[in-house]
């Protein structure tokens, strides 16, 4: 491994975690922003214009490529283009605080639009391009969005005639527009941009003004709109500096779509607040395409999801040998826990540790992480970010001793915590059941050295014969078996044991489903973990249902298996 602690300690932005944790104060970070002097606040100004008005103006801020396009934009380019889009919105009459949604594939226009929306003081709502009509409707309806930016290809999935608040639709890549309706006026992005001035008076906002509305799916009910404010930039900036360890010369690639919170917090805000060169690759995942991208651009810092790393692992190590990946110096993973097996594989094929970290849509930014300058325990999510207090609490809100599984909670008050669940105060209050603590809904334990270990979602933990079993532990063990590409584990009602463990498994290439293999997998878990943790049922499937951000949807498998309603499926991959 080339990124040993000794090798990186001097070069890392945070050379000593323990010292940083002891001395850190969020107030000190405020000095990094221009509003600390001017009092004028706007995320887009800090992320783009601050650099465009400095020696970084000609630095490449965005490298964009897909099957058809290959483009680059400096900070100055993005300043002027987002100014133009801000003017487009202002001319149409869009005001501060209005919800403006984006429903389009990754493209320069998406990023320019998003920055222009923020410059206008409006609240941006990013949607996954793969959403179908019901998912689009739910989010536009709940948010009372007045404006949507989309493409001709995606427009058929927008029930715009049935959304009374939606008055403007801006189509990207389309000069010929559909007929306006009584309520909706169509605009061409290209036509309006040509008319718009490159000078723009930014709408200065309060740090507590709404900035972005990300919808997140629960196991029940409609998706919830999680509101974050401009003040979140304090956390985006500092976590990108210390966890992503972004440095001046870096080419940074976050593979997440902006429809998912990682794609905004760490695909847009974190890197650009730090003045980094950000790479966006359009199109679908393929190991060859991804490795080619790293090689072509000389990517230094790479952030992706466990599913992607497991897929890369499943195609075998030989593929990596065909590409020059030596530019990589720091790899990170987020979205769901990273199995220890994948960390060891990363050390073998990339000679680098893959750094897992933990946060969620509601926290707005990274909360617990593995840091370049800190010893790693593969399979652990790491230690709390400086300025963050995390704890494992029981049902009554008492802190549990090391090694005991309980509720993962975070002391309220960090800069990027959610400020509201849109139109649902009762749901917002449920996140803070114990005075002063945010309850994540995840179960975890903390070991004697202060490292946190994920055990499962509160509603995923299995009670079998009086024992509590975290599904992630069993899944991680299964993935260690050479035949297994991916695994998901659920609890199934059982009259004798309360619940039994059922595993769903997708095999690697070259393996086929047999009774012998199923028994071998059961024994593999029994011998590797414990008898009570061994699955009593194993179902081998071609694929496992996942969200578009790569999380395996255990609740969907459980619903299919037990014949129950599946709940909201809008975030599920095709």
Task: State where each predicted segment sits.
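Conserved AMP-binding/adenylation subdomain of ANL enzymes
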Residues: 234-251, 258-301, 315
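Structural core segment of the AMP-binding/adenylate-forming
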Residues: 3-12, 112-115, 119-191
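Conserved pre-ATP/AMP-binding loop-to-beta segment of ANL
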Residues: 58-60, 170-171, 177, 181-188, ...
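Conserved AMP-binding/adenylate-forming core of the ANL superfamily
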Residues: 58-115, 132-137, 188-191, 230-231
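Conserved AMP-binding A3 loop
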Residues: 71-76, 203-204, 211-235
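Gly/Ser/Thr-rich phosphate-binding loop
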Residues: 189-193, 273, 291, 299-304, ...
């Amino acid at each position: 491994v080339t990124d040993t602690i000794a090798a990186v300690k001097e070069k890392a932005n945070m050379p000593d975690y323990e010292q940083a944790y002891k001395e850190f104060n969020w107030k000190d970070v405020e000095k990094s922003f221009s509003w600390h002097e001017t009092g004028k606040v706007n995320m887009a100004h800090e992320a783009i214009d601050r650099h465009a008005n400095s020696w970084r103006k000609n630095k490449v801020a965005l490298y964009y490529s897909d099957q058809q396009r290959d483009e680059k934009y400096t900070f100055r380019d993005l300043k002027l283009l987002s100014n133009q889009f801000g003017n487009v919105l202002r001319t149409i009459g869009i005001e501060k605080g209005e919800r403006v949604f984006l429903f389009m594939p990754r493209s320069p226009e998406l990023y320019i639009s998003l920055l222009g929306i923020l410059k206008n003081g409006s609240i941006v709502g990013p949607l996954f391009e793969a959403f179908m009509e019901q998912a689009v409707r739910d989010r536009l309806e709940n948010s009372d969005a007045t404006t949507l930016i989309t493409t001709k290809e995606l427009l058929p999935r927008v029930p715009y005639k049935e959304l009374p608040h939606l008055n403007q639709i801006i189509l990207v890549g389309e000069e010929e527009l559909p007929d306006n309706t009584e309520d909706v006026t169509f605009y061409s992005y290209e036509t309006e941009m040509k008319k718009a001035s490159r000078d723009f008076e930014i709408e200065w906002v309060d740090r507590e003004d709404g900035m972005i509305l990300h919808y997140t799916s629960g196991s029940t009910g409609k998706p919830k709109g999680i509101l974050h404010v401009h003040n979140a930039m304090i956390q985006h900036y500092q976590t990108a500096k210390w966890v992503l360890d972004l440095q001046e010369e870096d080419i940074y690639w976050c593979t997440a779509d902006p429809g998912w919170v990682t794609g905004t917090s760490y695909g847009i805000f974190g890197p650009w607040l730090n003045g980094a060169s950000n790479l966006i690759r359009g199109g679908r995942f393929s190991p060859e395409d991804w490795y080619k991208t790293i090689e072509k651009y000389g990517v230094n810092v790479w952030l992706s999801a466990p599913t992607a790393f497991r897929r890369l692992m499943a195609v075998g190590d030989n593929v990596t040998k065909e590409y020059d990946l030596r530019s990589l110096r720091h790899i990170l993973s987020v979205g769901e826990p990273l199995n220890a097996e994948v960390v060891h594989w990363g050390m073998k094929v990339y000679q680098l540790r893959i750094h897992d970290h933990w946060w969620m849509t509601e926290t707005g930014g990274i909360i617990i992480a593995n840091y370049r300058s800190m010893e790693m325990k593969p399979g652990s999510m790491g230690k709390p970010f400086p300025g963050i207090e995390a704890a494992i609490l029981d049902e009554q809100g008492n802190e549990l001793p090391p090694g005991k599984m309980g509720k993962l909670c975070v002391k309220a008050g960090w800069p990027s915590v959610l400020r509201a669940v849109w139109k649902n105060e009762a749901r917002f209050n449920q996140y803070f059941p114990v005075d002063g603590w945010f309850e994540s809904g995840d179960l975890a334990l903390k070991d004697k050295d202060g490292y946190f270990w994920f055990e499962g979602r509160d509603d995923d933990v299995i009670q079998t014969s009086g024992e509590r079993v975290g599904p992630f532990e069993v899944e991680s063990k299964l993935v260690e078996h050479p035949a297994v590409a991916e695994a998901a584990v659920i609890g199934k009602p059982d009259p004798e044991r309360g619940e039994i463990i059922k595993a769903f498994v997708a095999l690697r290439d070259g393996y086929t489903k047999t009774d012998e293999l199923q028994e071998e997998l059961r024994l593999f878990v029994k011998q590797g973990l414990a008898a009570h943790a061994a699955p009593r049922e194993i179902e081998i499937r071609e694929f496992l249902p996942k969200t578009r951000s790569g999380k395996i949807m255990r609740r969907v498998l459980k619903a299919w298996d037990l014949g129950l309603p599946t709940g909201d499926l809008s975030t599920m991959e095709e």
